[in-house]
Amino acid sequence: MDEFHRYGKEDSSWQQCFLYPLFFQEDLYAIYHDHYLDGSSSSESMEHLSSNDQFSFLTVKRLIGQIRQQNNSIVFFLNCDPNPLVDRNKSFYYESVLEGLTLVLEVPFSIRSKYSVEGMNEWKSFRSIHSIFPFLEDKFPHSNYILDTRIPYSIHPEILVRTFRRWIRDAPSLHPLRSVLYKYRNSPDNLQKSIIIDPRVNTRFLLFLWNHYVYGCESILVPLLKRSFHPRSLSHGSFPDQTHFDRKIKHIIRNYRRNSLKSIWSLKDPRIHYVRYAERSIIAIKGTHLLVKKCRYHLPIFRQFYFHLWSEPYRVCSHQLSKNCSSSLGYFLRVRMKPLLVRTKMLDELFITDLITDEFDPIVPIVPIIGLLAREKLCDISGRPISKLYWTSLTDDDILDRFDRIWKNIFHYYSGSLDRDGLYRIKYILSLSCAKTLACKHKSTIRVVRKELGPELFKKYFSKEREFDFPAFSSKAAARSQRERIWHSDIPQINPLANSWQKIQDLKS
């Protein structure tokens, strides 16, 4: 593989490299074999693989040969054998072939993504999730509309093969991919006759297909949007007198609409920003309502022709940030006006100016979070704490750790919101539910539990000092954090409650 990477650096015709011989390299399947044995949680499968015949690379090569011959007796995604041990053994070999197929196809994809994406109109598709919230905080105040879209999961298998064929000219390496995709498409369980790629299914093969497909879509869509809505214009940036600048522009347009409409339109400087997490993408636009209507019209057409699917179930929702809120990433996203008092001293005179700026203000969805806590049997639908009977068989430390972990995850994820009064209501619900669970376990009352365990025990687990696990945080830093927005570095592990609430919002929309 290092040889292929070297080849990709030196020669621009790396598309002509032959990947098919890599399928017969035993190292690929040995890596998956060791990974399967190390990560398997089933002792029965471990005993079966160790007691049965040893892992045979010859069997893997024969399976690859049968794929090339289009042998219909091989069904990758169906369990046809009544013997569970034989069926598990077959499934293991088929998964190893898929793993090898994925590893081989990742070689040119990694080369292409590393050396080609840098030149696409200064757009880079690989960004860490750590930068999503700071990106929204930086770009949303300078936008007035957002478009919220969802990328479809259902994809025709031939579309996937064609996207690979654009940059892989080795036809034999595409035959195994086409065979696997079409066998799954024609299976009796698949009624839609298309590939359902769910990135939440943690398989290397599906994740690779999803990432590659979304990468191909974004590599066309985002540069197209950049070129369409970024004209050469006089950009006034985000100066304090931007409001007065816009008033002057409106005055000029009103007086000279007939003569210089095109030149004045270039001064308006429409801007567009794109961000995506999982299957949801957000397009922030600074422009007129007509521009937003054009985007809403062209985006479904682009998706319909590129995805070859009817895009009505994945409609584009537009929101005006100054009036409406958009639900995304577990927040209600909005932009609010923030007054600023500026004092300017010139010689002996002091001038005071009131300015109004836009500020990104994410809102914590307290009511939906309480509803999700009610589904987890931590409170009722009105927010009244109840005991978690399922946890009464655990030790006291385990119960306290679980409640504390829930509170810590919620607070860390929603620490980007400045309005935290609702968060402390969630803290009260969790702490009282924890006390009721301990009281139910010991068959006593909450007062007795607090008296026996002591109030310091609850302060230890639900204290504000534990909200910051960094020794560099002092008391002054903790006090300052109440007035400042903090995006913690562990937010890539998105809270399950936020994900569940987002699914409910998607079903409603």
From Swiss-Prot:
Record-level Gene Ontology MF annotations: RNA binding
Signal peptide: none
Any one of the GO BP annotations: mRNA processing
GO cellular component: chloroplast
Top-rank taxon, per record: Eukaryota
Main location: plastid
Keyword Chloroplast included in the entry's annotation: yes
Pfam families given in the database record: Intron_maturas2 (PF01348), MatK_N (PF01824)
Keyword Nucleotide-binding: no
Function: Usually encoded in the trnK tRNA gene intron. Probably assists in splicing its own and other chloroplast group II introns.
Family under the similarity heading: Belongs to the intron maturase 2 family. MatK subfamily.
Xref: PANTHER family: MATURASE K
Name recorded for this polypeptide: Maturase K
Species assigned in the record: Abies firma (Momi fir)
